[in-house]
């Protein structure tokens, strides 16, 4: 599946609604699981986006790393819903996909799947379209490896992909794929779904081999 097709599917999905701004969807086709996370959808989501002091992300009482507090709160409500499908032994491949607010949740989900399914690490994939920065502070090489299959897709000046500011200690994880041209859109317009999809289609026309599993890194 091309990146533009994957993005369109993420944007146009019917999502399972939750009471914590953690809307998600999933496909289980044979033994392949794909989990989708919806973009910002209302005032509550935006309040979560702006709640960006760093907080400790813990598992079994141990601090793993530090993350955007608002996104971490949302992700914590999703774990009980997603854990059974991620750990299901019938699943032999996992892909996580998100846009905007949902891309931040995809960052968490990718790391969770990495730790929960070490047998699937070599094929685990994640895609964060218009992804904000989620992780705060320095990571060890071992920590960074959790996102070796994750790609942040940035439409150049997309304002969301530049927030929270790196000057505050926030950083992207995985690899960064930049699409589009500088100065073509305003920072806000560069984040709009219609413009991200347009630039993905143009990118794929220039790079015919580009799919959701194979694309040039920048």
Indicate residue ranges for each PLM-predicted region.
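Non-catalytic, mobile gating and regulatory segments of ester bond hydrolases
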Residues: 1-97, 101-218
């Amino acid at each position: 599946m091309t990146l533009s097709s994957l993005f369109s599917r993420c944007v146009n999905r019917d999502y399972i609604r939750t009471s914590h701004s953690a809307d998600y969807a999933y496909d289980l086709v044979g033994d392949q699981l794909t989990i989708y996370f919806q973009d910002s959808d209302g005032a509550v989501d935006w309040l979560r986006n702006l709640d960006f002091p760093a907080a400790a992300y813990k598992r079994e009482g141990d601090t793993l790393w530090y993350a955007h507090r608002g996104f971490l709160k949302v992700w914590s409500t999703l774990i009980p819903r997603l854990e059974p499908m991620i750990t299901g032994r019938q699943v032999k491949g996992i892909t996580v996909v998100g846009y905007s607010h949902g891309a931040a949740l995809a960052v968490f989900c990718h790391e969770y799947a990495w730790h929960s399914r070490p047998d699937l690490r070599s094929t685990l994939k994640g895609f964060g379209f218009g992804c904000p920065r989620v992780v705060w502070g320095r990571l060890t090489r071992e920590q960074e490896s959790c996102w070796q299959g994750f790609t942040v897709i940035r439409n150049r000046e997309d304002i969301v992909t530049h927030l929270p500011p790196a000057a505050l200690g926030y950083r992207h994880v995985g690899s960064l794929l930049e699409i589009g041209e500088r100065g073509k859109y305003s920072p806000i317009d560069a984040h709009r779904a219609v413009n991200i999809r347009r630039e993905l289609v143009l990118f794929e026309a220039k790079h015919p081999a580009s799919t959701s599993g194979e694309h040039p890194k920048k």
